Swiss-Prot record:
This is Ribonuclease VapC1. Toxic component of a type II toxin-antitoxin (TA) system. An RNase. Mg(2+) binds at D37, D150. Keywords: Hydrolase, Magnesium, Metal-binding, Nuclease, Toxin-antitoxin system. The gene is vapC1. The keyword Signal does not apply.
Length: 194
């Protein structure tokens, strides 16, 4: 495809638009669903056109102008734009809270995870927090451009002074007043490869 890993040319848009309806039907027929994160679009390495591609409508809001916006406008006829059901968002938020990733996920990130959960889809992302939560939800994920995570990670929040552990993100310790930081929890993290 002319846009995979390369720059867009305005002439390519007409060709893509002409083939979009037929191509979209072929992608759906193959039965593979991919939910694309903003980082996958930014990487410009979308070579996964062997299935049904979708992303949450919030991705469009994250990419407002320039070549990437043009790329989204060209790809829109071939990509389903959807919003996840509330029940799936709730599952994602509960899981992300348990892993300690909730504060690192934007609403778009949560939407990506919830759509993948709702449609039993594979996520395409370079975001490590999304990959980590996806692994806990037993969702498949592919990296777009950078190395993917190779194990599940659980995070804890610990005071830098008195070492008190907090159940969730806190900026300042209520005991000693020191800063609370997120740390990798070796005891809760899974050894299994993802």
């Amino acid at each position: 495809m002319p846009w995979v890993g390369s720059q867009f040319h305005k002439g390519d848009a007409q060709t893509i638009m002409a083939l979009s309806n037929v191509l979209y039907q072929v992608l759906i027929a193959l039965g593979m669903i991919y939910v694309i994160d903003t980082s996958a679009i930014i990487s410009r390495n979308l070579n996964l056109l062997e299935g049904d591609l979708m992303f949450p409508s919030s991705v469009i809001g994250e990419i407002k102008k320039g070549k990437l916006r043009y790329m989204i406008d060209v790809l829109l006829p071939m990509i389903r734009v959807a919003s996840p059901d509330h029940e799936y968002l709730k599952i994602v938020e509960e899981t992300a809270a348990k892993t300690g990733d909730l504060m690192n996920l934007s609403q778009t990130d949560k939407d990506v995870l919830a759509l993948a959960l709702q449609y039993d889809a594979t996520i395409v992302t370079d975001d490590y927090s999304i990959q980590n939560v996806a692994s806990y939800l037993n969702l498949g994920f592919l990296n777009a451009n950078i190395k993917r995570i190779d194990k599940q990670i659980a995070w804890i929040y610990r005071c830098t002074g008195c070492k008190k552990v907090f159940p969730g993100p806190v900026k300042v310790c209520d005991i000693c007043g020191h800063e609370v930081k997120r740390h990798y929890d070796k005891r809760k993290s899974m050894i299994r490869k993802v």
